[in-house]
């Protein structure tokens, strides 16, 4: 080969090498991804602040013997860009990993991780995603709950599953998944990490709330419904006729009578045969056809209660007593959703209810263990199984309303699957002074503050199950008695002021007079009309357990809403600072005209332009609408 040929060959090689190395970019108005396939370097940039996050490596695997397989131990086999998506394939003799980078909804981003074994099942103790070091100033996890969002400079980082552990310490951050089952060649495990940004510290909660509503399967929308619990059923079966009678009563007094749409009649515990197979009981031998048709005739639908772990008290014991007969797995005296046999049946039955009975909402009550692994299960825990179940349910009917109760926690990641979760604590209880209704309200809100506001400050209050409005014949602690009009109005308006979209009515119709029906109708209509504001609802004020004044605030540019309550039997002063209460962004109006929606208080100015001290009377509940002053 002469010198000229050699030079040409070298040049061709360099061109070829350069052709195989490239830098890829994805971007939208909020975030930009950059990936260099030669250096394997990945970075994400906040378009607004310029802050940059670049992980030490995109991922790494830790084996049971603590050996670590780094991303550098993999070979990149493919990089494919299509629209707003970039896929990167990583190959290793024992594992394959695919990264899927996406920019979402105009200002967010995500990285999907899919991990599979090669050749045979492989043990992996832990998968670590997006590990950073020294990339941000004092990053932290905002919340005490596993999988709470990581906050790093102007970024918030969230996993798609509540079983993922988020970690931040001394300028390092990562997301970890501990695996209890081998990774399979044909059944990869998948996780997604979401990224969003916030323009200023005061807007972190609102930015997270907006992000969740943008990507959740069913955007925020009030779901107002009757629930049979403590009314026609309370650990007891009920009949088709019981349900039809209630439908007639609600139609007469509320739906047709006062022009309020009821989204559903939810049938709580009492409809199944208690065999543990989730089959219809004798009272519904023909399924829900009759009640479904009746509901449709009044522009409503049917919702349904099921309990993955089997329910509560004697009905649960009766269901679980059949576990051995049908080969269903149990843990601690309850069904285990992650058990192969039980999951197969539960999943099959719930899909049948969706497809054949046209159920529009589910109250899944009791999600089971988070730490126990069932032998031969494909799932690490019942939490893992519940995520798979909900995915299947959504695939069958995307617009389902899914409420998860006991067994969940204040991880915002639940809202990538469910529409609401439990506020924690007891169904109903009493705390503090006052009538049973006032004590119930204080307990409800004290539990919310203790378990949600403090432990999961970025969890949207608009997606909590508060246990609704209670005035039912089989309730307890005094809530089974007819309430005064004032107490019922306080309970009703304070409930709708929470902004929750799960609007449960545990009400026996005969316990409401015309005044109460009017209150309920007015508040429900107000909630639906103001949903675009109430979606932003967040906590204001103090701790109900300490009997401090507290409440709820929500804001949008055109309008804001404030609800306050004094849980004490003594008058209390409250420092009213609407800029702080509404979490108003920089540059927006801070002077308002206040319009009373519920209650009246002479110490509250009709025109607000500066912080002021107001006084709430004992047990006073107040709700205002605030519009920017002209």
Model regions and ranges:
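Bacterial N-terminal signal peptides that target proteins for export
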Residues: 1-8
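Bacterial N-terminal signal peptides
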Residues: 8-16
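Acidic-aromatic substrate-binding/catalytic surfaces of carbohydrate-active enzymes
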Residues: 22-87
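Conserved structural scaffold segments of CAZyme catalytic domains across common CAZy folds
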Residues: 85, 92-94, 103-111, 116-317, ...
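Active-site-proximal substrate-binding groove within the catalytic cores of carbohydrate-active enzymes
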Residues: 186-187, 386-601, 613-626
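The substrate-binding groove and active-site-proximal loops of carbohydrate-active enzymes
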Residues: 227-244, 271-285, 328-345, 368-383
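Active-site-adjacent "subsite" loops/lids of carbohydrate-active enzymes
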Residues: 232-237, 301-357, 368
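Active-site groove signature of glycoside hydrolases
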Residues: 259-271, 345-376
